[in-house]
Amino acid sequence: MNFLEDCISSIISNTKTNYEIIVVDNNSPDKSGDFFSKKYPHIKFVLNKKNVGVPAGLNIGIQHSLGKFVVLLNNDLIVMPNWLDNFLDAYKKFGDALYMPKSLKFNNPEILDGTGGMINIFGFGFARNKGIRDVGKYDEIEEVSYAAGTCMFVPKKIFDKIGLFDAKFFAYHEELDLGWRARLYGFKSYYIPKSLIHHYGSAHWQWSSQVFYFLERNRWLVLLKNYSLITIFKLFPSLILIELSMLVFFASKKILFKKIKSYFSIIRLLGHIKQQRKIIQQQRKISDNEIIQSFCGTIKIPLEANDSIINDKFEKFLSSLCKLSKYDKIVREA
């Protein structure tokens, strides 16, 4: 509960612009929603009877909001002075887009927690520059692949145009999917370094077989929904190699059943994928050629996972496979 209280206190202390706070409690086991709804009667608390998943919870918060803009926040962070004003200044300059702040480690603010979400051409997402020292090198506004869900500023009318988060994701990659989909509709994502947050970063999850199940399943949801069939066809040989390597990797960690489970889940979701593909591909304004320009030909594995779950060899393998898949050619011809 301390995370949520610190987060709320930082918003109240460091926000000058008119705002409302909406807290969505996904049936948390500590009943923090009940506690804080009594302590902060001026804050709107939505108490779900069950855990509906991260994206559905976010959607509920968005639907309860009354303003022109929404900021989606994890509860395990604090915002710094003028954080919201800096978002609004960026909006005045760049217009309708998705925005994210510079994120620093809560317990060591000299270390970056992320300077933008990056997407690998095979659908892997990661936080750029996570774990490196902040030496003033990343203090310029930049376009990124997607705005991380830790803290995301969005003009509400974007949701009216592209739809809300895909609730089928349940956990992980939902913001990657939103950022990709937004870009297809013509809305970019920006990293705004003057807007600062300090993120604890491990309050919600640990690396586990269940995490990898959702990451792998949702990676395929993203690919099948958002790429054109032509691009999927071009990437298909490399995607097969990725799958074979992932099967070997999961087997080596004795969690192969989770990878197999992800395939069955995708099969069950084919109707949903088909429905979403039809909407996205009919309404998209940006070609794969253009959107891939903001992707990267490599992947960086989070430091938290390097020692026990994924090693440098797999990271290098993915980068090599990007070259073998003729990434530059796909960019030119997609």
Please report, for each region that a protein language model flagged, where it lies by residue.
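Conserved donor NDP-sugar-binding/catalytic core segment of glycosyltransferases
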Residues: 77-120, 124
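Glycine-rich, basic loop-to-helix element that forms the pyrophosphate-binding segment
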Residues: 48-65, 75, 86
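Short aromatic/hydrophobic "clamp" motif used to bind/position activated sugar donors
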Residues: 70
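A recurrent flexible, glycine/aromatic-enriched loop bordering the glycosyltransferase active site
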Residues: 111-112, 121-126, 132-154, 176-178, ...
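A short, conserved alpha-helix in the catalytic core of glycosyltransferases
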Residues: 145-196
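Short, acidic, metal-binding catalytic loop of nucleotide-sugar glycosyltransferases
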Residues: 9-18
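Active-site-adjacent helix/loop segment of glycosyltransferases
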Residues: 185-304, 311-315
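A conserved acidic beta->alpha catalytic loop
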Residues: 10, 25-34, 50
